[in-house]
């Protein structure tokens, strides 16, 4: 979203567009995906495999470089992130208020990914993880009937699992919970199975066994699966407005 806004946004803001901040940032999430797919198609037409094209698409390389700069706290990139992140959470607050929802504690991945990286380093020291020639870090779970899982990219930037490791660790350290329940759709069943197993192999079975993934079936449109990056979604704010109107 940040890169697409920077390249195609023309300085558009929630105020100038009249859009909720989360909707505006979502718009550029879709815009990024549209340009990315166009570039992949062009590279495939030039003879690259689809896997190569996805890796070599210029806009994806730019996004990866922006992530690297963000993790390095580049002032320009970090400032843009703070601005757009603010737009998103202002939009979320409006939606949560309409639902009467509030939270005692919010954990942000931007505040836990470094802890996740520390856990990755711990795993390397313990021999639980291994480093490939491209410098990326993986865990081999094939003996457990699963797969190999990427934990850190070759350029040192984090992935979702890095962040989730850090977040889970911090939640239990701060709260000493009896159970931690993740309410997430069933498309993430494998992810949470891997998360629990990694934490167990790191030596945290005393609390990782108390992680529960409360899975639910995905809601689909008649046309198929909803995909936020393609803009094929039912907007929560519209749904709330419709329910209020119907009531």
What label would you give each PLM region?
Residues 1-247:
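NTP-dependent nucleotidyl-transfer catalytic core
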């Amino acid at each position: 979203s940040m890169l697409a806004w920077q390249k195609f946004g023309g300085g558009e803001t929630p105020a100038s567009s009249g859009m909720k901040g989360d909707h505006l940032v979502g718009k550029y999430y879709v815009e990024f995906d549209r340009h990315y797919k166009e570039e992949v198609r062009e590279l495939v037409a030039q003879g690259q495999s689809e896997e190569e094209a996805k890796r070599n698409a210029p806009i994806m390389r730019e996004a990866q470089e922006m992530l690297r700069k963000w993790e390095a706290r580049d002032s320009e990139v970090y400032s843009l992130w703070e601005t757009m992140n603010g737009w998103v959470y202002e939009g979320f607050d409006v939606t949560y208020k309409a639902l009467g929802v509030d939270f005692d504690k919010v954990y942000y991945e931007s505040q836990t990914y470094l802890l996740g990286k520390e856990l990755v380093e711990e795993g390397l020291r313990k021999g639980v993880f291994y480093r490939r020639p491209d410098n990326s870090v993986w865990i081999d779970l094939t003996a457990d009937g699963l797969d190999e899982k990427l934990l850190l990219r070759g350029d040192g930037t984090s992935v979702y699992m890095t962040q989730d490791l850090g977040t889970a660790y911090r939640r239990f350290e701060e709260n000493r919970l009896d159970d931690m329940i993740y309410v997430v759709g069933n498309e993430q069943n494998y992810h949470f199975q891997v998360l629990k197993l990694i934490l167990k192999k790191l030596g945290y079975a005393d609390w990782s066994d108390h992680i529960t993934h409360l899975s639910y079936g995905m809601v689909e449109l008649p046309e198929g699966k909803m995909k936020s990056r393609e803009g094929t979604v039912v907007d929560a704010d519209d749904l709330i407005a419709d329910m209020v109107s119907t009531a």
